[in-house]
Amino acid sequence: MDKFWWHAAWGLCLLPLSLAHEQIDLNITCRYAGVFHVEKNGRYSISRTEAADLCQAFNSTLPTMDQMVMALSKGFETCRYGFIEGHVVIPRIQPNAICAANHTGVYILTSNTSHYDTYCFNASAPLEEDCTSVTDLPNSFEGPVTITIVNRDGTRYSKKGEYRTHQEDIDASNTTDDDVSSGSSSEKSTSGGYVFHTYLPTIHSTADQDDPYFIGSTMATRDQDSSMDPRGNSLTVTDGSKLTEHSSGNQDSGLNSTSRPGGKPRVPEWLIVLASLLALALILAVCIAVNSRRRCGQKKKLVINSGNGKVEDRKPSELNGEASKSQEMVHLVNKEPSETPDQFMTADETRNLQNVDMKIGV
């Protein structure tokens, strides 16, 4: 009996987990020239093989580049990477720093990650915008998974079934990649860091190596005026920003300018020469000021020694006897501001200015 309750408890614990694995939410957008975007469970969780199966379940196929460009010209844009035939792309009409690296047009990503959203193409859809609710997954087959279709207007339709034909996609149903960005509040996604990797050859390596090649075009000039980007990793056909301003309803607020941030502005050569001349003039002015101060800073000092001068400056007495001599010496000195000993220039102007009493004796 205890063993029965033990197994029952384990079954109740595992039941929510099994139910979680059997729930799939598919968020879809309006159709533009038959092309629409599908997001699974609010995150990047669709492999390339599952993308083909999912489009097949919607009675659709992966769109080609031409079909994606046509949808773009009708106003279709998102901020989510998704599979098309042979590429992973974002269609952009309005530039945004967090969407397609601020590019416009069909932005093509080359990356080594494996899970994204997907784009699908329904050939029977109207050529213009079509936002009617999708209520069925016509080509799904029997299965235990609860599949819920979430339309842009919020309506939801659920059914039991399965659309995946590859076992590895079923086994890896919980494997997801990090999100790149969110296009609008209606797209259930979380913003996060993402590094773009380019595999195209470049002549000069640059600091921003997050630029896969880029195609922006209109239907009229799609096959003309192809040119290579100066950095070697962008292919521009025409400017996708010339397309109609009408979009799929998920345009972002606070859009940035279409111009890409370039390198640092170069300093004009004439400004460098002018700065050098000013610096040289300043150095010369300082040198002249210091030299003038040294010349004008000389001081003349008059020193009068009364009675006791230096020994070498004294004159030996020519007088005999006990008479003492007193000498006054006047020294005219050039006082230099340096710390060297004072040098004196001595001039004796008076000698023996005394009355000598002589004793006359025999």
UniProtKB/Swiss-Prot annotation:
Q: Compositional bias (Polar residues) at which positions? A: 233-260
Sorted UniProt keywords = Cell adhesion, Cell membrane, Cell projection, Disulfide bond, Glycoprotein, Membrane, Phosphoprotein, Proteoglycan, Receptor, Secreted, Signal, Transmembrane, Transmembrane helix
Q: Which domain of life is it from?
A: Eukaryota
- Record keywords: Disulfide bond included? yes
GO molecular function terms here? Answer: cytokine receptor activity; hyaluronic acid binding
Region (Disordered) residue ranges read 158-190, 211-263, 307-327
Please give the Gene3D superfamilies that the UniProt record associates with this protein: Mannose-Binding Protein A, subunit A
Question: Among the entry's GO cellular component annotations, what is one?
Answer: apical plasma membrane
Residue numbers on the Extracellular membrane side: 23-269
Bias class Basic and acidic residues marks the residues at 158-169
Region entry Required for interaction with EZR, MSN and RDX and for co-localization to microvilli, spans = 293-311
Which stretches are annotated as coiled coil? Answer: none
Leader sequence segment: 1-22
Q: Which InterPro entries match?
A: C-type_lectin-like/link_sf, CD44_antigen, CD44_antigen-like, CTDL_fold, Link_dom
Record's bilayer topology term: Single-pass type I membrane protein
Compartment list: Cell membrane; Cell projection, Microvillus; Secreted
The record describes its quaternary structure and partners as: Interacts with PKN2. Interacts with TIAM1 and TIAM2. Interacts with HA, as well as other glycosaminoglycans, collagen, laminin, and fibronectin via its N-terminal segment. Interacts with UNC119. Interacts with PDPN (via extracellular domain); this interaction is required for PDPN-mediated directional migration and regulation of lamellipodia extension/stabilization during cell spreading and migration. Interacts with RDX, EZR and MSN. Interacts with EGFR. Interacts with CD74; this complex is essential for the MIF-induced signaling cascade that results in B cell survival.
User: Entry's PANTHER family?
Assistant: CD44 ANTIGEN, HYALURONAN RECEPTOR
Q: What is known of its domains?
A: The lectin-like LINK domain is responsible for hyaluronan binding.
What is this protein's name?
A: CD44 antigen
Source organism of this protein record: Cricetulus griseus
